Amino acid sequence: MDPLTFDYEKLHVRVDRGVFELFQPNDLTTTLRIPLHWLGVLVHYRKPGRPGELIFGAVNDPRTALYGTDLASFGYRSTMAVRVPSSDEPLFRAYFTEVAAHAGRPVI
């Protein structure tokens, strides 16, 4: 299977052989590499009409939804410097729905 990749602004993510990797060329200190069974992803909107925060992290329970993860389910989380307008959220949902299918994990 070829790696599943997704690019958004200066964010590059990929899944290959059960491992998720995240890269931001302008900030290599926020590179993330994590097995799919621990991955949780959420676009968190605090205020209506404002871009949301993109959150990646490790979940405590691998049966937790891979995308749309509840904030309380994260054992560790990191907010990326990427803001996601609600009009772009379906792009993330489509990619992570495909990733979740490969990992045997649900999405919300």
Residue ranges: model-predicted function:
Residues 3-4, 28-108:
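Acidic, Ser/Thr- and proline-rich intrinsically disordered linker/docking segments
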Residues 6-28:
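Short, compositionally biased strand/turn segments
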